[in-house]
Structures are given as structure tokens and as C-alpha cells.
Amino acid sequence: MMERVYNFSAGPSILPLPVLEKVQKELVNYNGTGMSIMEMSHRSSYFQSIIDEAGSLLRELMNIPDEYEVLFLQGGASLQFSMIPLNLMNTYKKAGYVLTGSWSKKALQEAEKVGEVQVIASSENEKFTTIPKLDGLLGDEKLDYVHITTNNTIEGTKYVDIPHVDKVPLVADMSPNILSERYDVSKFGLIYAGAQKNLGPAGLTIAIIKRDLIGGADRYCPTMLNYETYSKNNSLYNTLPSFSIYVTKLVLEWLKEQGGVSAIEEQNKMKSSLLYNFLDESKLLTSPVDPAYRSLMNIPFTTPSEELNNEFLQKAKERGLVTLKGHRSVGGMRASIYNAMPVQGVQQLVNYMKEFELENR
């Protein structure tokens, strides 16, 4: 059997090894039930306890106030691009979007199908290598909400400070960096995230939504795209991705054992610093991102040529450092170092980068 590799994929991504080992142990016979979670009714008392525990752990780890609901959904963040305007564009039929990368553009394109969209700020002219300044841009606009993407997976940028939005709900796609650093949930009207980066396996989407934003969908909104459907039914309106929720619960337990979000944030800063410190000194490998807005989770870098990039990737794979190829729209390489990536994985990558540079001076 092949030894486990260090998987730097942007998603689906690395999961904590203790979680995988527990899944392996419980896979065939969960908790003495004589069946697997994958076989179990989503309306059984066993699964009810799993989803309740997952919700409680998320509330505890993110310090989610009581006036917010935690919803377990499907369809990924991409379906949220449609659900959000269908539910929230209900007063002015207009929303504000900040463009900071490919995913925020896709969110905007879906919102344009529902109502009017105003681009409040954009870093597209800078090829999304930075985060635009928002001071004074979010004042008295008549908007139903403002949408941001807190971390840009493809481009490798993140917000250092969350923009202050007065009286307008702030909606955030946190798919890549939820639970990786501390956020004040009360600053947001809605937070959403696909699970397959920092929460668990693909198939699950989490929405954390202020209760007063639920129930405003147009009567033509499809039932399955209405937040109220899930709120009224404890997320159990139809069959959920039960296995993904179970694994996510185990990941949340693991995160709590690590010391919670504040502890993992410090570890994430240390891991990213290992990479950025090397890139800042390197004469061969460079980072295209504005240093003021560098992501802790997704770190793109490149060599001067496509030939060297391919050589780097091939030799990395031979060393058990895999899925480092950058997104096709950016090129080069990208190391995604989510919560579950151990420090030694990043250190091994940096050691290899140093050797590669020495070989190609």
C-alpha cells in the first residue's frame, strides 16, 4: 500500500488523518448500530444526534450568536450564488458585489439573472492580485445586501479587514477559509461555505444566516432554493448528504481538540510564513500576490518558464507532494494549505523548493 502523500489540492482537499482513521473504524458498523452511516436513515435518532452535534460544534467554534441559524445544504457555494439573490433581493431588487477573483465574478453573474447588480469595487484591472479599497463606498446605497469573497482560492488573496457595511446585510463566501481564522459573525448577515476545503468532504454546504433574513423570498422562488424551507425543517426537508455531515462533525471535533480557531489560526500563519518567507528570498520562484493581501490558505507561485513549472510539478510528485498545479486561469503552481495540512507537509514543500532552486540556478 502506498504511503499517504501531502495533498495540496484546492478542493476536495486534505482531511485530518485522525478523522479518516475514525471514519475507517466506524465505516461498517457505526456506534453499534450494525450499519454504516451511509446506510442509515437521515431521520433516525442516530443521525439526528450527528447533525445536532455538528451544528453545536460549529456554533461553539465560530461563536455564532443565537439570532443566527446554521443550515446544512447541498449544491456547493455555486448554488448559493443563485439562492442568495432569490432570497435576499426583496426590497430594492439590487445588490452590491465586490469583485476580487473568479468566484466573486461567478457569484455576480448569477445575481444578475435575478435583479440589478452594482459593482462596488473591483481589482480586475490588477488581475485580481490585490483587494480593492472600500472606504466610503458602502454608505447610503439602496442595496438589499453586499457580497464579498473573504478568500480567493484561485488568485491567493484575502481580506485583511472585513469592510464595514452600515444597515446593509454583508454576505460572505467563506468557502476556502472558514474556521481558518477568527471572524466576528455578527458583522455578517449571511456566511456560506462549501465543505470540501476546510470543513469536510464534498457534497455539503453550510449557511450561517441571520434569522431576520429568512422568509423574504419571492413566492416564485423554488422550494429547494428557499432558506425558509431548511429553517422550518431543521435542514431535513429532504435527504441530506449524511455521510458528509458525519465527517464534518468529526473534523469539527478534531478542530476543537487542536485548541479551536484561535489556535489553528496561529498554526496557519506559521505555515504560510514558511512559504512566503522562502518566496520573498527566492530568485527563481515568485508570488504574484500583493503582500498586503496574501491568503493564509492558497499560495500561488511560479518559475520564469512553463518548462520549469512542469519539471517542478513532476519532481514534486515523485516526492509525495501532489496537486500543486495552479489553476488554468493563473498558471504556475499553487499550494493550498488548509487547516488539516500539517506543518511538516509545508516544511517538506519548502525544503524541496530550496533544492529545486539550487538545481536550476
Swiss-Prot record:
<dbReference type="GO" id="GO:0005737">
    <property type="term" value="C:cytoplasm"/>
</dbReference>
<protein>
    <recommendedName>
        <fullName>Phosphoserine aminotransferase</fullName>
        <ecNumber>2.6.1.52</ecNumber>
    </recommendedName>
</protein>
<feature type="binding site">
    <location>
        <position position="196"/>
    </location>
    <ligand>
        <name>pyridoxal 5'-phosphate</name>
    </ligand>
</feature>
<dbReference type="InterPro" id="IPR022278">
    <property type="entry name" value="Pser_aminoTfrase"/>
</dbReference>
<comment type="pathway">
    <text>Amino-acid biosynthesis; L-serine biosynthesis; L-serine from 3-phospho-D-glycerate: step 2/3.</text>
</comment>
<comment type="function">
    <text>Catalyzes the reversible conversion of 3-phosphohydroxypyruvate to phosphoserine and of 3-hydroxy-2-oxo-4-phosphonooxybutanoate to phosphohydroxythreonine.</text>
</comment>
<dbReference type="GO" id="GO:0030170">
    <property type="term" value="F:pyridoxal phosphate binding"/>
</dbReference>
<comment type="similarity">
    <text>Belongs to the class-V pyridoxal-phosphate-dependent aminotransferase family. SerC subfamily.</text>
</comment>
<dbReference type="GO" id="GO:0004648">
    <property type="term" value="F:O-phospho-L-serine:2-oxoglutarate aminotransferase activity"/>
</dbReference>
<keyword id="KW-0032">Aminotransferase</keyword>
<dbReference type="GO" id="GO:0006564">
    <property type="term" value="P:L-serine biosynthetic process"/>
</dbReference>
<feature type="binding site">
    <location>
        <position position="103"/>
    </location>
    <ligand>
        <name>pyridoxal 5'-phosphate</name>
    </ligand>
</feature>
<feature type="binding site">
    <location>
        <position position="153"/>
    </location>
    <ligand>
        <name>pyridoxal 5'-phosphate</name>
    </ligand>
</feature>
<feature type="binding site">
    <location>
        <position position="43"/>
    </location>
    <ligand>
        <name>L-glutamate</name>
    </ligand>
</feature>
<dbReference type="Pfam" id="PF00266">
    <property type="entry name" value="Aminotran_5"/>
</dbReference>
<dbReference type="InterPro" id="IPR020578">
    <property type="entry name" value="Aminotrans_V_PyrdxlP_BS"/>
</dbReference>
<comment type="subunit">
    <text>Homodimer.</text>
</comment>
<dbReference type="InterPro" id="IPR015421">
    <property type="entry name" value="PyrdxlP-dep_Trfase_major"/>
</dbReference>
<keyword id="KW-0663">Pyridoxal phosphate</keyword>
<feature type="binding site">
    <location>
        <position position="173"/>
    </location>
    <ligand>
        <name>pyridoxal 5'-phosphate</name>
    </ligand>
</feature>
<feature type="binding site">
    <location>
        <begin position="238"/>
        <end position="239"/>
    </location>
    <ligand>
        <name>pyridoxal 5'-phosphate</name>
    </ligand>
</feature>
<dbReference type="InterPro" id="IPR015422">
    <property type="entry name" value="PyrdxlP-dep_Trfase_small"/>
</dbReference>
<feature type="binding site">
    <location>
        <begin position="77"/>
        <end position="78"/>
    </location>
    <ligand>
        <name>pyridoxal 5'-phosphate</name>
    </ligand>
</feature>
<keyword id="KW-0718">Serine biosynthesis</keyword>
<feature type="modified residue" description="N6-(pyridoxal phosphate)lysine">
    <location>
        <position position="197"/>
    </location>
</feature>
<keyword id="KW-0028">Amino-acid biosynthesis</keyword>
<dbReference type="InterPro" id="IPR000192">
    <property type="entry name" value="Aminotrans_V_dom"/>
</dbReference>
<dbReference type="InterPro" id="IPR015424">
    <property type="entry name" value="PyrdxlP-dep_Trfase"/>
</dbReference>
<keyword id="KW-0963">Cytoplasm</keyword>
<keyword id="KW-0808">Transferase</keyword>
